[in-house]
């Protein structure tokens, strides 16, 4: 039997008035009916104990709950229950109304009160001789002795089980926060109320219970210093314990004050368990003493030997009794040890202020309403489970936010480095190389040069006065359909508009036969610049600069060379690169095809070095290249570039004349050429003429001597909208600005 009492007689008598208790705690009482339930063993059940009236201190079981909850709670409950008739409204949820008459209270004055003094002193760090009258409690009836039994058993069980369950002291209950408020007024008004103990109502409530809980920790340091004084008074007052209940009751209150403050301070600091190691008298050491006293009382059957000698009681802190001295050696410490412990606790109070409330259970939320909001209060309000869940969520969000901020700062740093040193990236880029080093002035100079021309023989030269008119008419008319490409150029245009000979129209190249197979358009290697359109799965259409005599055949769509016989793009890069820096023309004539069918496949390309932006641009350019009858593919050419065309009859030369100031900016769909400048007297781009007999134009090639540079100019509007990367766009813009300034 644990914490149940001193002997078997008490157990038998107690079983008569009490119901079954928890079997583990009270095996002999398990079969008996009636009485409250067993004390809880966890914190949730402990909280339930404080909210259910039937779970209040009743027998050893209820007292054990107090011991598991906190030592201060049990001590204060016992002491104040003794003073206020055992059932105060301070324990409103837990009171079991008592019907004890004045006779039972009078019994308590002489014997039970003295035991209560000893139990209170024991909880405050002093030796106790509590078990003196254990038998007397069991001898009475339940109606007479129920309050006293609850008080006594609460003290004994809290002392007997405290060492075994000392790990639960870190979770004090609401009483550890409430009772210091009452303790602050005990010195003033409680002792006056303690004298007429018999007249007190069992349900009288102390007025100081509802005071601000901030006094819980303010009076700890003051009361700790008075512990020794009150202990000396209480020990000295044991001499007069037989004189009357009034004087002993005052001692009870003094002891209650000191003992509760000591135990409250123990719960106010988490360092209470360290005190036994430091050599100071600690509350946790006292259960050993009381257990030894219980055993001694049970064996000897008398407790007078521990209480009667007053001299031993006065010197008990310095020299304990032999029976107790054998059990616990910590009691040999002087009284200054407890004061030293109080000094250390006061020194640690400022550091552990936040940790004090952390040890409170969920039932103590009402005691901290007047304090400032702190995480510990939130724990008490929403519970530890919800608090830690919310805390984990907040920490995760902060971690994600920190990672995002880190990435943002890294991106900003990279952008600043790119903006500060673009030349480093340009030098390390093999694709760029020197592609962006040519200036606009150089580009303009190259554009001023005439395009390659196809010169016909003198026999084909006919009156050229009709060329402007024909050019104008062809420019204003809508472009013919694809099926009218070759026949219209050879037949319809000559019959209806020109009126020239229909049988002598054919192209006769002036170039020698050994140059027939050479390209009519030749590029100058050192000055060619190309922006290769590449489709990227992530960025879409991207331009990659390329510097060389000609665009790479494998990675670029062929540029268009207008006003020229459609040329076939070589299938391999080797043929392309070995064709004297030009676009090779197949040896056989390129037939335009029958009407109604496309005369130019996708691998054909006409005029003025415009890279294909996308397949749509290629289709539009091919559509324009299907009309070899000159400006018909560009019906609105005059509108864009103010270009006038002079077309020659079968014996003449078809020429393009453009003003020097006219330029057509390259774009993906509107204009298929970059910057076209043709002089009236300069060489003209090669253009085939159709024969009247077969109406099949033959490709003709110009001379290399008449060919000049064709440079791919980087369009500014496209370079600004390219989306390959911000660094590449920035580098291009910076280089162009530097070139403009120079």
Curated annotation (Swiss-Prot):
GO CC, alphabetical: nucleus
Region called Disordered, residue ranges: 1-23, 115-163, 186-248, 280-337, 451-523, 665-726
Expression induction: Circadian-regulation. Expression increases after midnight, peaks just at dawn and gradually decreases during the daytime.
Motif (Nuclear localization signal): 344-349
Transcription recorded as keyword: yes
Function: Involved in the regulation of flowering time.
PANTHER family linked: PROTEIN EARLY FLOWERING 3
Protein's name according to its UniProt entry: ELF3-like protein 2
Organism: Oryza sativa subsp. japonica (Rice)
């Amino acid at each position: 039997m644990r914490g149940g009492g001193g002997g078997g007689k008490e157990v038998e008598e107690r079983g008569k008035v009490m119901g079954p208790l928890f079997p583990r705690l009270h095996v002999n009482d398990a079969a008996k009916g009636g009485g409250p339930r067993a004390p809880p063993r966890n914190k949730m059940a402990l909280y339930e104990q404080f909210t259910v009236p039937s779970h209040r201190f009743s027998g050893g079981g209820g007292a054990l709950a107090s011991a598991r909850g906190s030592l201060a709670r049990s001590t204060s409950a016992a002491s104040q229950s003794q003073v206020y008739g055992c059932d105060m409204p301070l324990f409103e949820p837990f009171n079991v109304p008592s019907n004890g008459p004045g006779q039972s209270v009078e019994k308590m004055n002489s014997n039970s009160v003295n035991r209560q003094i000893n139990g209170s002193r024991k909880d405050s760090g002093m030796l106790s001789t509590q078990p003196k009258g254990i038998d007397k409690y069991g001898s009475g009836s339940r109606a007479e002795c129920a309050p006293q039994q609850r008080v006594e058993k609460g003290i004994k069980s809290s002392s007997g089980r405290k060492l075994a369950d000392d790990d639960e002291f870190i979770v004090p209950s609401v009483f550890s926060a409430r009772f210091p408020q009452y303790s602050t007024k005990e010195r003033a008004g409680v002792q006056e109320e303690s004298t007429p103990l018999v007249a007190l109502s069992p349900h009288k409530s102390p007025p100081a219970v509802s005071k601000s809980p901030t006094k819980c920790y303010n009076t700890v340091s003051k009361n700790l210093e008075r512990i020794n004084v009150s202990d000396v008074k209480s020990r000295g007052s044991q001499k007069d314990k037989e004189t009357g209940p009034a004087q002993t009751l005052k001692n009870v209150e003094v002891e209650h004050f000191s003992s509760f403050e000591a135990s409250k301070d123990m719960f106010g600091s988490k360092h209470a368990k360290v005190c036994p190691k430091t050599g100071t008298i600690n509350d946790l050491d006292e259960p050993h003493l009381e257990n030894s006293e219980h055993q001694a009382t049970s064996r000897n059957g008398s407790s007078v030997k521990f209480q009667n000698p007053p001299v031993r009681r006065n010197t008990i802190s310095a020299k304990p009794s032999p029976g107790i001295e054998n059990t616990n050696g910590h009691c040999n410490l002087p009284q200054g040890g407890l004061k030293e412990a109080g000094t250390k606790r006061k020194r640690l109070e400022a550091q552990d202020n936040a940790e004090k409330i952390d040890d409170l259970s969920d039932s103590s939320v009402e005691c901290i309403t007047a304090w400032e909001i702190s995480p510990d209060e939130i724990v008490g309000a929403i519970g530890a489970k919800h608090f830690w869940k919310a805390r984990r969520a907040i920490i995760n969000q902060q971690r994600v936010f920190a990672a995002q901020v880190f990435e943002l700062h890294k991106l900003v740093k990279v952008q600043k480095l790119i903006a500060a040193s673009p030349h480093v990236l340009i030098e390390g880029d093999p694709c760029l190389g020197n592609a962006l080093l040519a200036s606009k002035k150089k580009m303009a100079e190259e554009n001023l040069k005439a395009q390659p021309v196809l010169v016909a023989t003198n026999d084909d030269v006919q009156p050229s006065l009709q060329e402007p008119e024909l050019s104008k008419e062809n420019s204003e008319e809508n472009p013919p359909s694809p099926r009218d490409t070759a026949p219209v150029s050879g037949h319809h245009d000559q019959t209806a508009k020109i009126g020239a000979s229909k049988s002598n129209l054919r192209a006769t190249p002036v170039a020698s036969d050994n140059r027939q197979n050479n390209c009519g358009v030749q590029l100058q290697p050192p000055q060619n610049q190309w922006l290769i359109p590449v489709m990227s799965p992530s960025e879409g259409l991207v331009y990659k600069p390329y510097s060389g005599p000609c665009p790479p055949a494998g990675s670029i769509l062929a540029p268009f060379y207008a006003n020229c016989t459609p040329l076939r793009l070589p299938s391999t890069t080797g043929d392309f690169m070995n064709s004297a820096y030009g676009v090779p023309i197949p040896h056989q004539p390129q037939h335009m095809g029958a009407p109604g069918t496309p005369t130019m496949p996708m691998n054909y390309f006409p005029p003025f070095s415009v890279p294909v932006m996308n397949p749509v641009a290629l289709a539009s350019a091919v559509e324009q290249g299907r009309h070899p009858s000159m400006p018909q593919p560009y019906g609105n050419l005059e509108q864009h570039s103010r270009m006038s065309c002079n077309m020659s009859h079968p014996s003449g030369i078809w020429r393009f004349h453009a003003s020097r100031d006219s330029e057509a900016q390259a774009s993906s769909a509107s204009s298929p050429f970059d910057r076209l400048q043709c002089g009236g007297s300069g060489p003209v781009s090669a253009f085939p003429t159709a024969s009247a007999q077969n109406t099949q134009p033959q490709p003709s090639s110009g001379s290399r001597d008449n060919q000049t540079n064709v440079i791919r100019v980087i369009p500014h509007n496209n370079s600004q909208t390219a989306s390959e990367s911000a660094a590449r766009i920035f580098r291009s813009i910076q280089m162009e600005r530097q070139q403009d300034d120079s």
